[in-house]
């Protein structure tokens, strides 16, 4: 059965993360939540409709997309893995890959 209106969280609203957030927000029925270290970036994403809300509850997500540098991605997932619900799909879209 296809799940409609999935809750998608995107951590890192730089060029790649914000582009994906905008595409998901405008072309799907997903509810997109976003998080970035820069508060102004989050506020701009909210104002432009790129995200529906700031990401504050990882446990509500169906999908978590991490758009950070590789080491920051590993650290973020290690620090927050227990907050994710069972069955949440976690993926990264790091622009640079190396063994971590």
Residue ranges of predicted features:
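Conserved acidic residues
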Residues: 52, 62, 88
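N-terminal Rossmann-like NAD(P) cofactor-binding module of classical short-chain dehydrogenase/reductase
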Residues: 64-65, 91
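NAD(P)+-binding Rossmann beta1-loop-alpha1 motif at the extreme N-terminus of oxidoreductases
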Residues: 1-54
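A short, aliphatic-rich alpha-helical micro-motif
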Residues: 57-60, 84
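A short helix->loop->beta-strand "cap" motif at the edges of active sites that frequently abuts
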Residues: 29, 84-88
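Rossmann-fold NAD(P)-binding glycine/threonine-rich loop
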Residues: 94-100
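Beta-loop-alpha module in the N-terminal Rossmann-like domain of NAD(P)-dependent dehydrogenases
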Residues: 67-79, 99
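Short beta->alpha hinge that forms the Motif I/post-I loop of the SAM-binding pocket
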Residues: 37, 68, 93
């Amino acid at each position: 059965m296809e799940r409609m209106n999935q809750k998608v969280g995107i951590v890192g609203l730089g060029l790649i993360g914000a582009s994906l957030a905008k595409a998901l927000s405008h072309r799907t029925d997903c509810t997109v939540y976003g998080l970035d270290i820069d508060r102004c970036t989050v506020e701009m994403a909210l104002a432009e409709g790129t995200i529906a809300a700031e990401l504050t509850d990882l446990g509500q997500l169906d999908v978590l997309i991490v758009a950070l540098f590789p080491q920051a991605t590993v650290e973020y997932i290690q620090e927050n893995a227990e907050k994710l619900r069972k069955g949440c799909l976690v993926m990264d879209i790091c622009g640079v890959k190396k063994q971590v």
